[in-house]
């Protein structure tokens, strides 16, 4: 069995702070599509917690709000080509 080259890479940098906790926002509103758009990729996918820097509670609420906004046709399911 051949050995793998390279070791485990470590992530460096500052830990991101949850935007909602920082601004004391308690409710993630599905109608605020400008805010929700910040947490989706250019392809329309929901970004991961390690990318957005949200806490677990607000990541769940944001994902739920994005899904509701998609149902109401405020956000696209996928981005146009």
Swiss-Prot record:
<protein>
    <recommendedName>
        <fullName>Small ribosomal subunit protein bS18</fullName>
    </recommendedName>
</protein>
<dbReference type="GO" id="GO:0070181">
    <property type="term" value="F:small ribosomal subunit rRNA binding"/>
</dbReference>
<dbReference type="InterPro" id="IPR001648">
    <property type="entry name" value="Ribosomal_bS18"/>
</dbReference>
<dbReference type="GO" id="GO:0022627">
    <property type="term" value="C:cytosolic small ribosomal subunit"/>
</dbReference>
<comment type="function">
    <text>Binds as a heterodimer with protein bS6 to the central domain of the 16S rRNA, where it helps stabilize the platform of the 30S subunit.</text>
</comment>
<comment type="similarity">
    <text>Belongs to the bacterial ribosomal protein bS18 family.</text>
</comment>
<dbReference type="GO" id="GO:0003735">
    <property type="term" value="F:structural constituent of ribosome"/>
</dbReference>
<keyword id="KW-0699">rRNA-binding</keyword>
<comment type="subunit">
    <text>Part of the 30S ribosomal subunit. Forms a tight heterodimer with protein bS6.</text>
</comment>
<keyword id="KW-0687">Ribonucleoprotein</keyword>
<keyword id="KW-0694">RNA-binding</keyword>
<dbReference type="InterPro" id="IPR036870">
    <property type="entry name" value="Ribosomal_bS18_sf"/>
</dbReference>
<keyword id="KW-0689">Ribosomal protein</keyword>
<dbReference type="Pfam" id="PF01084">
    <property type="entry name" value="Ribosomal_S18"/>
</dbReference>
<dbReference type="GO" id="GO:0006412">
    <property type="term" value="P:translation"/>
</dbReference>
């Amino acid at each position: 069995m051949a050995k793998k080259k390279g070791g485990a890479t470590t992530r460096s940098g500052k830990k991101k702070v949850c935007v909602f906790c920082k601004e004391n926002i308690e409710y993630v509103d599905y109608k605020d599509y400008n805010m929700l758009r910040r947490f989706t990729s250019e392809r329309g996918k929901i970004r991961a917690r390690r990318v957005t820097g949200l806490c677990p509670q607000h990541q769940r609420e944001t994902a739920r709000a994005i899904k509701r906004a998609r149902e109401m046709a405020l956000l696209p399911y996928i981005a146009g080509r």
